[in-house]
Amino acid sequence: MLELYPNYYPKFTCTADQCPITCCQEWKISVDDDTYRNWFTIQPPTDVAPQKATLSAYTTYQAETRVIRLNEQKKCPFLKENRLCRLVLAYGDAILSETCTTFPREFHTFSNHVEKTLMPSCPAVIDLWKEETKLSFPSVDASLCSDTDNLLFSVRSHLISLMQNNPASPEHILLECFYILLESQQQTLSSDLLADYFSESVIGQLSDAIEQMDFPLEDTLSECNELLQDLAVNYQKEGLYSRFLTPLLALADQISAGTVTYDLTEEWDTFEQQFFQYQALIRNFLTNEFFSDLLSPDGDLESIIVQMQWIGMEYAVVRHSIFLKWLSDGKGELRYDVVRDSLVVLTRMTGYEKDDIYEYLENSFEHIIWDWGYFALICG
């Protein structure tokens, strides 16, 4: 089957023991059925503690998924002190589960092609994007798809192009993208409609209209603060990402209580000047999210809208966490590792499956599809 992937995809190399945020710690490591059956017959390396009869004994069933049971330090029991894998050292790569073998690669199998991307929840991927001025994404050959699917792929391509090529800020373009998606849902989708919505004149008018709108910064900061707290609550209870989350949530609680001793809006203005230097990286991150997450093999226009909401919320909490970290670090120069680590941890925390995204939105909001104003509130 035809394989399509972005220009950066073949450049990825795992940094193994040099990785600053290992994928062998603080999140679910799935074990596929074939690996699980194989592990029933294999003894653990002698330096794994505690010793058990077979590798399968180190797994557990969690949220309908078989995973490796983490130790008290929330690490994989097979992770050595030097951050290398005991299983690989003892048995080679073939012993690993599919998750360990493929991460951070992501595959989506459509009717006539497979799309491959890399996920932002790996520091080495963010490092790759930092070095790329502009990511390049493949187009889907119209002859491979039905007319309906072609229109959906065209929607995605237009959104990617808008984010990559429009000189406005990434936040401004997110607002344009979401507005166009909502408007498209009200009419019969066609190539002519898309050509009109994404024409230079219509985009210009939409951009001017957004520029004239007032988005109270205090409300944006307050809502993003609540979103971060809500997304983090379960991770905090389980003691996951505590080194990253604990100082941020302490500051977030102070903001919610109104006990911070400085003007957040004034600090935000200074922060934005620091954050601007990473605009190319943020644009690469968002365009990759568009390519990898907006359209699934069973997707439609509504699911694209829902995924755009999730991407918008994801970005809002990433940006807010970077802001809080910058505040807690003394409001000086915004370091690259702060931006990278926030992208990695928050995308791990928001890396929900499609059904889980719908469940979260149903439980947290009155309607699955947001008003444009709410999207503008958190992303503006």
Protein language model features and the residues they cover:
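Detector for Asparagine
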Residues: N7, N38, N71, N82, ...
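Charged, amphipathic alpha-helical linkers/stalks
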Residues: A124-Q205
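Generic alpha-helical secondary structure signal
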Residues: D34-R37, N150-F153, S157, D337
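N-terminal cysteine/histidine-rich coordination modules
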Residues: M1-R83, V88-S97, T101-P138
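Hydrophobic, aromatic-lined core segments that form the binding pocket/scaffold
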Residues: A168-G380
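Conserved aromatic-histidine-acidic binding/catalytic patches
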Residues: V88-G92, F110, D147, L151, ...
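Iron-sulfur-associated redox domains of electron-transfer enzymes in respiratory
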Residues: E98, T102, F110-H113, E132-P138, ...
